[in-house]
UniProtKB/Swiss-Prot annotation:
Major subcellular site: cytoplasm
Knockout mutant characteristics: No defects seen in the sperm morphology and the percentage of motile spermatozoa is comparable. Howevwer, velocity parameters such as average path velocity, straight-line velocity, and curvilinear velocity are slightly decreased in the spermatozoa.
Name this polypeptide is given: Sperm-associated microtubule inner protein 10
Region (Disordered): 1-33
GO biological process: flagellated sperm motility
Biased composition (Basic and acidic residues): 1-16
Quaternary data: Microtubule inner protein component of sperm flagellar doublet microtubules.
Compartment annotation: Cytoplasm, Cytoskeleton, Flagellum axoneme
GO cellular component terms given for this protein: axonemal B tubule inner sheath; sperm flagellum
Amino acid sequence: MASEKDDGPALPKLDDDNQTAENTCKPAEEQPQQLRWDDIHLPRFSLKQGMIPTRYVMPWKENMKFRNVNLQQAEACGIYAGPLEDSLFWGYSERLCHGEDRKAVLKKGLPEIKITDMPLHSPLSRYQSTVISHGFRRRLI
């Protein structure tokens, strides 16, 4: 005869004092110590590469003519000359390695300039229609 009680394993009850229950119910913004999913960058290689791909450094990074002169001129002008994001090449395939927080990396460079207007006429343009420029302006609004 089947009993009316459930004979399955007893599950632990979640109390109000249980910290794990509180953490699972809170959104990510209210959890100060934990990382959110958009703060983490997991690099991926392509499937055609092996487990440990061969390291490749571009030749112009190793031996660039007048590199020291260019760095001195950039320092004199106050231009940041360091890498924003160092790109690694493994087996001739590029990937970006985020060693720093994404927001901190973007603050190093110049801000993006938003083009507010496109000229209505260009002597080099094949299509000299105002429809193209009006469509471009509509996207910026």
